[in-house]
Amino acid sequence: MKCNACWRELEGQAVSTTCGHLLCTEDAKKILSNDAACPICDQVLSKSHMRPVDTNPNDDWTNMSMAGVSPQILMKSAYRSVMFYIGQKELEMQYKMNRIVGQCRQKCELMQAKFTEKLEEVHTAYQKMAKKCQLMEQEVENLSRDKQELQEKFAEKSRQKRKLDEMYDQLRSEYESAKRSAIQPANNYFPRAQPDLFSGVPNIMDSSDPLRQGLAGLPETPGRRDEGWAPPPRQRRSTSGPFELSAGSPAHNAAPPVDIRPRQPARPVFGTAMNNTSAALRNMIISPVKRPQLSRNRPHMFT
């Protein structure tokens, strides 16, 4: 048997109440001194409602207390005693169940608090991951937009490259055609007007000097005379544009200058006594005739 207030094992003396509960002597004194209420059913108790009992009576007390009692009363007393015992066991089981339920409730509260904290952490992590996913989606969208722009730029650059390749091929073909036309045979050149070397002979023959009349047809002394034959002026090469063949050759545009000044009669090469026409003709055949030379710096005359 256990006390219904402190649930300790009862040994020896105990206190029984009229409401059917069993208390130890210490708890009974506390109840009487405080509010005088039963801790189980809250019934008001007084000293008349309590009675001391012996939880472990000896044989002498059992024989003396049961002597002279009818069996009906004994059976009734035994029934009440058994019901009291069953009630005490039920109270004891209920106390144990309440204690276990309290412990389980406490554990559940601790687990609930722990899992609530974990759930909050998971929810916080989920919110962070959701924000990160949004940022990643925006980054993917920006990268897709950049990829599309780069593809458009690449297509434009490819189109420009194809156009440049076509222009390069066209210029290369034009250059090859110009190169082939530049190495054409000499019969395609324009003829250049040759100066008349004997244009001044009649004027010389009309001179009053008989010596000059005899030597009027003689050519000049072999050798170069810069004062008589000046080199033709150089044609300025235009640097304003590429080489064009459609504008015409330099020989076609400007004819070489011809010296039309009257030449001075040359001195006789074979002596001063040669006054006849046969000697002059002989000297003309023997002596080389000076012809104008082309300048190396003159541009090529071709079509």
From Swiss-Prot:
Coiled-coil portions: 119-184
SUPFAM superfamilies documented for this protein: Myosin rod fragments, RING/U-box
Pfam families xrefs: zf-RING_5
ZnF locations on chain (RING-type): 3-42
Phenotype upon gene inactivation: The mutants hei10-1 and hei10-2 have normal vegetative growth but exhibited complete sterility, due to shrunken and inviable pollen as well as sterile female gametes. Reduced chiasma frequency, with a random distribution among cells of remaining chiasmata, but normal early recombination events and synaptonemal complex (SC) formation.
Entry EC no(s): 2.3.2.27
Region (Disordered) residue spans: 201-268
GO molecular function, one term: transferase activity
Gene Ontology terms: cellular component: chiasma; chromosome
Expression sites by tissue: Expressed in young panicles.
Swiss-Prot/TrEMBL keywords: Chromosome, Coiled coil, DNA recombination, Meiosis, Metal-binding, Nucleus, Transferase, Ubl conjugation pathway, Zinc, Zinc-finger
Location(s) in or outside the cell: Nucleus; Chromosome
Lineage: superkingdom: Eukaryota
GO terms for biological process, alphabetical: chiasma assembly; homologous chromosome pairing at meiosis; protein ubiquitination; reciprocal meiotic recombination
InterPro entries in the record: HEI10-like, Znf_RING, Znf_RING/FYVE/PHD
Primary location: nucleus
Catalytic activity: S-ubiquitinyl-[E2 ubiquitin-conjugating enzyme]-L-cysteine + [acceptor protein]-L-lysine = [E2 ubiquitin-conjugating enzyme]-L-cysteine + N(6)-ubiquitinyl-[acceptor protein]-L-lysine
Pathway: Protein modification; protein ubiquitination
Function: Ubiquitin E3 ligase required for class I crossover (CO) formation during meiosis.
Subunit annotation: Interacts with ZIP4 and PTD.
Protein name: E3 ubiquitin-protein ligase CCNB1IP1 homolog
